[in-house]
């Protein structure tokens, strides 16, 4: 019965209008890949590597490391300008922007680098969905609607992204010819997920089912 309920997934009303847009799956996939490429990029940057090795930054506080966490939600937003005549910045106002911020902050609690909302997961391609891991089903503050949250298991430890660096021209070329196959062929995506084994996923699914029940 539980499996049947899980299979009959409730579609988030927020994504219904987005799902009708042509090419939305590829668009959403590429947005997530953009985050993953940023994650790989900061671990491939020579200046950041030099900062990590600078004893002045780590003196008295232990090892110093530059890292990033990401949160993503899908929906509408209003763009506007804030600031003064001396400095103007763009800002985005929307409950979806707030949700993305909450996803990012919650990633610390779940011990992951990247967290995606159900709204994003429902828009991604079938191939991309096989790479996501369902972390939990939660009710976000200010809302009574339950929402599934997901992660893409990205880890930099034990990965030398410098060995798989590419020119800017090659990166642009690969981005323009996107296909869902990239999830199984891109060196960056494969390397940051190399710590995920079939055994881990099987054990996790058993534990996750018990947790959800």
What do these predicted ranges mean?
Residues 40, 62, 67, 76-79, ...:
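Intrinsically disordered, glycine/charged-rich C-terminal tails and inter-domain linkers
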